[in-house]
Amino acid sequence: MQALMLAAGMGKRLGRYTQNGTKCMVQVNGKALIEYAIEALVKANIKKFVLVVGYRSEILKEYISSKFNESNLNGMKIEYIENPVYDKTNNIYSLWLAKEQLLNDDTILLESDVIFDEKILFDIIKSPEKNLAMVSRFESWMDGTCTLLDEEKNIVGMLDKAHFKWSDINEYYKTVNIYKLSKEFSTQYYIPFLEAYQKAFGKNEYYETVLKVLTFLGSGNLKGFEVRGDQWYEIDDPADLAIAENRFAPTAEKLRLMENRYGGYWRFPQIVDFCYLVNPFFPPAKLEDELKSNFGVLLRAYPSGAKQQNLLAGKIFNILPEHIVVGNGAAELISSFCSMVTGKTAIPYPTFNEYPARFCNSETVEIPVNRDTFEYTVEDILKVVDAEKANNVLLINPDNPTGHFLKKEDLFKLLDELKERNVQLIFDESFIDFAEKRYTVYSY
């Protein structure tokens, strides 16, 4: 069995990462994609590796020669086929240039921008099925050609973006762009149809389109070989590269890279997020249905102005609209408000770091808390106010991140004491939903 990689493309969407090299030379965690691929092929005992090259081909050849030789290729031969018109053609023509190789042996077909767990390569090679397309059950982050499988894993349909329907995603399997093709399949079906398709539609097409035609005609007996979505990733742009580095980082590095993303974990469906303030029970099904029902209007219509939003918020919370300011999340409101605060501000620590970071015109002083329980009392607050002659007190209730909570009667006592001292209370109840409704300082 041999392997064939299509590596002639320019990889324009990767920008600076492909200015001086090819897509398969892009580094993922300090190693080029081509290195990952060759190492996996060597371990799989592949005896010949053919690359169809074009853009920056000499640079790629030199790079491979600098990394691999007889001592670490385990007898695997590397051959190159040049696509001299790589900038005017698409991968259907690159594959056509390798037709003689496809006719001579069973082939593992790879694309140069896919990083994968070597185990899935071993598994597809060991499979008794002769003709396989590696696929993953569709997930929201995926993009590109999808397949439909029957109960016996036969591919009965291939869909491009034009025919993709979000309503049918539970039936879709995304192509991984790794195939196992027998020389009989290539001889009887694939090569003849590649030739015919190019004559009819030209060379600026995709080889998967021919597989789509074969599937439509019920020819070729191509089956789906299912793998998990976290075992591979296709790298088309810098955002993809960042995700791939997360997925394939050494275990010790994964947490650091994940934390640097600060959210967006929906791109990693296998991750369960216990760090960010997300509610696994939200939204209720009824609310979600209502949002879906009105999504078209919400998407197309211009949003209400601040006056109308204040009026609606006041209705919900039973507060006069002139006492409400609506913002794009708490961080925006905190930044705007804190810039107007002057003098000294007393804060229990640890606290939500967005506040002290935004007090650009105010000096912050610490209200000490019990280091074992993180508790503090009204008396603890007043002691610091008097000692430091504080002008403001910041209180988050329940506190973030400690969860400490002052009851309503304690809050009113604190308000009376601060009023006598002419000290302003900055009061944040962002997390009041974690307490019972009767504990909030307002009624609604």
Model-derived regions, located:
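Conserved alpha/beta core of the MobA/IspD/sugar-nucleotide pyrophosphorylase nucleotidyltransferase superfamily
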Residues: 1-3, 172-260, 266-270
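N-terminal nucleotide-binding beta1-loop-alpha1 segment
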Residues: 1-19
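PLP-dependent aminotransferase-like
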Residues: 339-395
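Conserved core of the sugar-phosphate nucleotidyltransferase
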Residues: 117-201
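Conserved N-terminal alpha-helix of the aminotransferase class I/II PLP-enzyme fold
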Residues: 289-328, 332
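Conserved N-terminal catalytic core of the sugar/cofactor nucleotidyltransferase
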Residues: 1-5, 31-105
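N-terminal "arm"/small-domain region of PLP-dependent enzymes with the aminotransferase-like
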Residues: 246-301, 388-389
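Active-site pre-lysine segment of PLP-dependent enzymes
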Residues: 123-127, 375-389, 401-444
